[in-house]
Amino acid sequence: MAAANAPFALVSRLSPAARLPIRAWRAARPAPLSTGGRTRPLSVASAAQENRDNSVDVQVSQAQNAGNQQGNAVQRRPRRAGFDISPFGLVDPMSPMRTMRQMLDTMDRLFDDAVGFPTRRSPAARARRRMPWDIMEDEKEVKMRFDMPGLSREEVRVMVEDDALVIRGEHKKEAGEGQGEGGDGWWKERSVSSYDMRLALPDECDKSQVRAELKNGVLLVSVPKRETERKVIDVQVQ
């Protein structure tokens, strides 16, 4: 094959004395893929942020058993969303109690990560993603919200033990009793939703005036603060 007709040109920068006699060169190019004249960009997935344990000690467990028929049981794992925030274990996952200050700090971090820049939890930031719990604090009271879908007022219990706010709830449901596929058995679906949380209240909160209200599966808790008088003592300088 002549050098002028070769699909690729070969350039040698060696001296004439060091060149080896080359009789013929052949260049093989791969066959083009049938992409229809379009090029597909290469998408590179960047590493996600560290899996921070930014959540409250609200233990929610749901178990569903559908079918007691013979055969192998397959357990499906729940899908993880792109912005997966679990409401369990805020700082130390082994600690059974969380403080209200930790919850406030966690809410600030969660909303800062969601919008990408520091914020004070504006209404626009809240509209982007609804968290399963929320807490707000002002000079008069502390307001908390916990999502408890499917639970009635009789199934939720709120109490104050010493300096801790305890929230517990459990809902059991049985449905779908009937004949299974092929008529070889009966099946029944059971679901259980359970909530158990202990939250340490600060000293300035009035534990005897805690109010709780459940509306449409949302628990609203209000903890008023005591009015503290500042005492000023003049210290004589000698």
From Swiss-Prot:
Occurrences of domain sHSP (ranges): 124-238
Q: Name one GO cellular component term.
A: chloroplast
Keyword Chloroplast in the entry? The reply is yes
**Location in the cell:** Plastid, Chloroplast
Membrane-crossing ranges are none
- Report the superkingdom from the record: Eukaryota
Which residues fall in a compositionally biased region of kind Low complexity? 58-75
Family that this chain belongs to = Belongs to the small heat shock protein (HSP20) family.
Q: What protein name is recorded for this chain?
A: Small heat shock protein, chloroplastic
